[in-house]
């Protein structure tokens, strides 16, 4: 969402969790849950959340694993200072929308079982993971699957890109960042960038394992 934008940074994915708990961030507890608790003291209980008292009188809130969990069945972890990650979602119908800026900064994955199997096969090719094998793990207990070799993650923000069919795609600038980029391209530093792009050689190399659509 424009009010909670996804940060731009690079890191390395180290593991994934099947059947994750969702530890609700303090900002969401304060801004979204406490007002609803004032209206209905049983609000969290009705949704299956666990409330854990903390020292100093505060509370921690978490949602147990399951089909209603806000993270879905899988979350993909690359520990970072922004507390964001990739994850499944129980509201898969939102992927049918043309505009999908609904999150608090994390990125939702449309086909998490396929994505998990692909990543695990990249780092552990002898294990022969399949989406079916991943789904067989779904349950009520967390399962950590660590990568022997971390996988690089680069989160970018693009409002124009070329799709797999070679067609130019344009998206709305929901974060309002295009103006700054256009200004950069028009100044002297932009000339340097144009020179780099003009002399760059295109690369047609494909990854060894095909990454599924829907991320």
Each language-model region and where it sits:
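Well-ordered beta-sheet/strand-loop patches within structured domains
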Residues: 1-215
